[in-house]
A protein has these predicted regions:
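Phosphate-ester processing/binding pockets and catalytic centers
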Residues: 1-177
Length: 177
């Protein structure tokens, strides 16, 4: 079944991780509405690390009830996170291609987006249209489904209580060492 993936990252040295919120196309509209309903008055986006602990709990619990699947890819990193990110990203893209995903939306890191694009070109080969995977980098203020990945990445990286809160939506954890 074709799916869409919405991807964000979290770095908690010595661990780097990428979370992908996997969404069925028929649920995109409903999930966007659900995510926007979580905004506070005047808020343009959810950025989990900026939220207060009580609100974090409420947000994590709300996301755990959504009809979404989250996949997490982790790798240890000592200093530079980019090699770890690209290893996680490549594994994610490979899994998305195997699932015949149609859309990949990545939280933009502006100038650093070029590294993701290189990895995508390498994996998609000389005929990217054969995969039917369309990808784009967007700012998280313009795509509310990226917030699911942001919350999941933060909670997974924080461990213990936080990881338990999002466990209902967690489907896959790939540790790349």
């Amino acid at each position: 079944m074709p799916v869409h993936a919405f991807v964000d990252e979290s770095a908690r040295p010595p661990q780097y991780l990428i979370a992908a919120a996997i969404v069925e196309p028929s649920r995109v509209r409903l999930l966007r509405q659900s995510m926007r309903a979580l905004l506070m008055p005047g808020q343009r986006e959810l950025h989990f690390k900026k939220e207060k602990p009580l609100r974090r709990r409420a947000l994590a619990d709300a996301i755990a009830r959504l009809p979404v699947e989250v996949c997490v890819y982790t790798r240890s990193c000592r200093q530079l996170g980019e090699p770890a990110r690209q290893a996680c990203f490549a594994e994610l893209v490979g899994d998305l291609l195997a699932r015949q995903a149609h859309r990949l939306v990545i939280d933009s890191r502006n100038e650093q987006d070029i590294y993701d694009e290189r990895t995508l070109r390498r994996l998609l080969g000389s005929q990217p249209s054969a995969s039917q995977l369309v990808y784009e980098h967007v700012d998280s203020t313009s795509e509310s489904l990226l917030w699911i990945a942001d919350v999941a990445a933060w909670c997974f990286g924080a461990g213990r209580e936080w990881r338990k809160r999002i466990d209902p939506v967690m489907s896959t954890v790939i540790d790349l060492g």
